[in-house]
């Protein structure tokens, strides 16, 4: 599915001994390994529902099917993901590449206004909030590696005790 800001982390790579088993596979190619396991911004390589950009934290790999990644300092990543998920970037992308396959070259062609922007700090805060909200949403599904409890179970547990207290008070008042 299409997710914006965070998520779609679904595959596990057996990386024991620096990927030794994968290195032994005929035809395996390792490119840009200096960037492996570093945080960045990624997107689906092919999409028919528009481009959506997601934060990919430390500890992940990237490939051409999931989409390339952009690596910057963490502040720049938050600013960039806000820009990339904006309507203006969607417009630029539709002009630069009106196909289903979004390439890194198209993404880096989007003009970026840095800290000269008066709203820079506000944009950073909104981006961090969006990433946090989307991470909580992603982690509320069993497909997330960080899933613990479904949110409805938490809601039921939180609401069960006040309901019991209210009923107990009502019963005392009626007797």
Regions found by a protein language model. Name each.
Residues 17-20, 85, 89, 128, ...:
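Generic surface-pattern signal
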Residues 1-62:
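Segments forming glycine/polar-rich beta-alpha architectures that bind adenosine-containing cofactors
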Residues 1, 20-23, 65-70, 165-175:
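Charged, low-complexity surface segments at secondary-structure and domain boundaries
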Residues 109-175:
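Non-catalytic DNA-recognition/assembly elements of restriction-modification systems
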Residues 6-8, 94-95, 135-137, 142:
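Short, solvent-exposed loop/turn and secondary-structure capping segments
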Residues 34, 44-109, 116-119, 133:
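Basic, amphipathic alpha-helical recognition segments used for DNA target recognition
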Residues 30, 99-100, 160:
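Hydrophobic alpha-helical segments
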């Amino acid at each position: 599915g299409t997710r914006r800001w965070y998520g779609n982390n679904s595959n596990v790579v057996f990386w024991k001994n620096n990927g030794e088993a994968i290195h032994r596979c005929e035809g395996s190619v390792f490119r840009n390994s200096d960037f492996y396991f570093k945080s960045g911004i990624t997107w689906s390589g092919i999409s028919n529902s528009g481009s959506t950009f997601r934060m990919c934290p430390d500890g992940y790999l990237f490939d051409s099917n999931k989409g390339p990644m952009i690596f910057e300092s963490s502040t720049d990543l938050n600013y960039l993901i806000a820009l990339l998920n904006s309507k203006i970037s969607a417009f630029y992308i539709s002009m630069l590449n009106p196909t289903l396959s979004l390439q890194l070259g198209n993404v880096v062609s989007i003009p970026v206004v840095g800290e000269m922007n008066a709203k820079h700090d506000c944009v950073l805060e909104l981006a961090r909030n969006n990433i946090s909200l989307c991470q909580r949403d992603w982690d509320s599904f069993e497909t997330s590696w960080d899933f613990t409890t479904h949110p409805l179970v938490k809601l039921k547990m939180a609401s069960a005790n006040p309901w019991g207290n209210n009923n107990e008070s009502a019963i005392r008042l009626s007797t």
